[in-house]
Curated annotation (Swiss-Prot), chains A, B:
The lineage of its organism: Bacteria, Bacillati, Mycoplasmatota, Mollicutes, Acholeplasmatales. Homodimer. Belongs to the class-II aminoacyl-tRNA synthetase family. ProS type 3 subfamily. It catalyses: tRNA(Pro) + L-proline + ATP = L-prolyl-tRNA(Pro) + AMP + diphosphate. Gene3D superfamilies: Anticodon-binding domain, Bira Bifunctional Protein, Domain 2, C-terminal domain of ProRS. It comes from Phytoplasma australiense. Its main location: cytoplasm. This is Proline--tRNA ligase. Its EC number is 6.1.1.15. The gene is proS. Catalyzes the attachment of proline to tRNA(Pro) in a two-step reaction: proline is first activated by ATP to form Pro-AMP and then transferred to the acceptor end of tRNA(Pro).
Length: 474, 474
């Protein structure tokens, strides 16, 4: 007797967005849970998404002269304590190695939650002249932060990321680098992930522990909650002063270096899922999809059909990530399976279509089917993929714009917040920000570079100093 | 005043092999030390070597259907204890997370020294039928082992590696997979690293904790010491029984799966250095070299020379990893610098050569210089690189063969061992192996599939059961 497995259905996103999300993560086989809470297993299909992000960034880094390195997983507690804001921000969630199977360690070791202190210590050793600058290092690695509430990809005790750490002779150069990184992330969103972001500066309250300026890209999920998807920090000379990273400049003066750090993580995969997918499962934009095209013979035992399917597979496989499914399962099962997995294009090869010189192509992003001539469809594929990518980006962009409001009164702010999405308001500063967070649960996402909406802050009635985009967020 | 830095010289390998090795690691800027002993920083030039090994293996894995995944950094102590031999082998050197910045953990967590238990636990959850088999997973990651004596690349508390973990329905299939992996490593050595290995089974004493069979590739360093450079394990049903990984076979019987695991690490980079380099520094085989060709204009301010150098650079950069050095430093300094860094080919562009329509090409592996027509040299480069690679492999192979001896008496064994390198002897088993290790410091590297040299073991005088290749090793 055959064990027949049905393709598993996902929960409706309208009935339970959180369950819908974890259903997709698990049922599309992106991840599995391990036995330690907050640590997930990246399965082949999920890990391939991260590999494609890495490839995209590595390609860009090669053009800009950023070099990959690998710094240690651990550092001493002493090192951690050198920059005060930084340790205050990260210490509570840092994991410690205190012993081995055999004995206690003399000194506790911190597992990196981020690596500013390691890079700073190294830079202090090797930088002495303006000729040693800039240094443009990046590493892909795992980091550990002991988060309480965890959710696959979005927040884990361990996650995978890329962290850039650069050192410059001047403030201007470091500020340019900070902007370079956040613009690179915007480009990554636009070109690979089909994700539009709101990009801007973080408020004093929300900026990175140890930074002077933090820029962030923020994505808006389908449930109207925001997600911080990447950050870029101008560290000024904070770490340089704590670690004594000095250089002799061309004018013979000893000066502190200016530093930046910036990162995106596997969290981007969470955004990808939450922005694009539907109740049938995952919907992947074509350029990041591990399988871009799946070929399904409708009568797999029909020799003509099988031969044609193989021919098309061989034709396409040099250009695209393509999969030919010859499993002994029904076409219906296979359709559901690859819809669940969000494969952008499905080519159905059927005897009837072939008799008419045609194939059927299904597009996952709008669940549409069209017939194409089997002799000419190949030339259409680049256009199809491009259109799918563009439409997915535009749809997400439209959702973002439709859920971006502004408020002139605190009541209006609260009313807008009920509708989910972003609300802009001009505020007096951190006091207003804290009050808003306590009373509404919304946090400052980014500062907008736009004129004030109201001269006074609707929350404190003090003079407004900046317009800030608020939202509830993951 | 300019600060003039000399290219740093390395210690002679004949006077102090250990110092020569670490000099190259540090001065060729492959690594730097961190402040925690045993944890090293992989600098761009060193990390690029590992990236090229990863690319090679990923390309091969794609052909064979091995899929990349990422499993957690940690697991529970309970999980660790499930396979008895395994925990006995790895427990003493396992690092533990016991607390965070805020509080003690309820349960100690083990940082992976290797991930058999994590994969086994996952496989137990997802495998139920022969249709679920095989699973061919691989991960690139960091692992932690609390080694006492550490040496860059060769032995560290943290290292980077690739670990394959596969599951099969039959013993035969798993044994084939075990051999597939070790043969892949031999191919990697032959095609990318120009490293010949002795390949064979480990003795019972030396095999992996938890395995039935371990195959190993062993490289021979220039000082005559062996280095285990990669291993592949047939785990039998050991882990399957401990973790209850069972499947219903086509004959409806429930059976335990057969597993394999196999890995190579950044240790390969240590072998690369110790086998190929000389007293001028690193010598890199061309296909793994991060910079394959460096172009040095001898009169960088001469416009003709500069234009020609740039033209050649543009010509070559689409095909090779090529670097044009326009720094304001003397050609002599640059020559030493790239010799220290082991760049396989140096193209010198000089006014006098150009007047005769020529360029000079320096080959690092034999420190030879030849003139080539500047119009035709480009076509010679693939041949040059291939020849360099082949000659480097042959030289290492010759060294290996010249240092491989056999012994019919224990005294002969000891005499041969004085000359360094490998000594084969037919032994009675583990008792002889232990005696040899205690008395001579040599360990069993691999079992040879050759006829017995002597009917009795020269050490114990008992009946010999196998011929084993011994050596002192790293």
């Amino acid at each position: 007797m055959k064990s027949i497995k049905r393709v598993e259905k996902v929960t409706s996103h309208l009935s339970d967005f959180g369950q819908w999300y974890t259903d997709i993560c698990l049922k599309a086989e992106l991840i599995a849970y391990s036995d330690v809470k907050g640590f997930i297993i990246y399965l082949p299909y999920g890990y391939a998404l991260w590999e494609n992000i890495q490839k995209y960034l590595n390609y860009e880094f090669q053009k800009t002269g950023h070099q990959n390195v690998y710094f240690p997983l651990v550092f001493s507690e002493k090192l951690f304590q050198k920059e005060k804001d930084h340790i205050q921000g990260f210490s509570p969630e840092a994991a410690m190695i205190t012993s081995t199977g055999q004995k206690e360690l003399f000194e506790k070791l911190v597992i990196r939650p981020t690596s500013e202190v390691l890079f700073s210590q190294y830079y202090a050793k090797i930088i002495s002249s303006y000729r040693d600058l800039p240094k443009l290092y990046n590493q892909f690695c795992n980091v550990v932060r002991w988060e309480k509430a965890t959710k696959p990809f979005l927040r884990g005790k361990e996650f995978l990321w890329q962290e850039g750490h650069t050192v410059h002779a001047t403030e201007k150069e470091a500020l340019d680098q900070t902007l370079f990184a956040i613009q690179l992330y915007e480009k990554l969103g636009k070109e690979l992930l089909a994700l539009p972001f709101v990009c801007g500066r973080k408020t004093e309250k929300e900026k990175f522990a140890g930074a002077l300026i933090t820029y962030s890209i923020e994505a808006l999920m389908q449930d109207g909650q925001a997600l911080q998807a990447g950050t870029s920090h101008y560290l000024g000379t904070n770490f340089a002063q704590s670690f004594q990273i000095q250089f002799q400049d061309q004018d013979h003066q000893n000066k502190y270096v200016h530093q930046t750090s910036w990162g995106v993580s596997t969290r981007l995969i969470g955004a990808l899922i939450m922005v694009h997918s539907d109740d049938e499962g995952l919907i992947l934009p074509p350029y990041i999809a591990p399988i871009q095209i799946v070929i399904i013979p409708l009568q797999p035992k029909n020799e003509l059909v099988q031969a044609e399917a193989k021919k098309i597979f061989d034709d396409l496989k040099t250009t695209y990530r393509v999969h030919l499914d010859l499993q002994n399962k029904t076409p219906g099962w296979k359709f559901s399976q690859y819809e669940l997995k969000g494969v952008p294009l499905r080519i159905e090869i059927g005897a009837r279509d072939l008799a008419q010189g045609e194939v059927t192509i299904f597009q996952r992003y709008n669940n549409s089917k069209n017939n194409f001539s089997k002799n000419t469809f190949k030339a259409e594929i680049p256009k199809l993929l491009k259109t799918i990518h563009d439409k997915m980006y535009q749809k997400a962009q439209k959702h973002l714009e439709a859920n971006r409001r502004q408020a002139s009164t605190y009541q209006e702010f609260k009313d807008h917040l009920q509708k989910k999405g972003y609300v802009a308001m001009s505020i007096s500063g951190m006091d207003a920000e804290i009050k808003i967070k306590t009373e509404t649960g919304a946090t400052a996402r980014v500062i907008l570079e736009t004129p004030l909406i109201t001269p006074n802050c609707p929350v404190t009635d003090k003079k407004a100093i900046q317009t800030v985009l608020f939202a509830k967020s993951y």
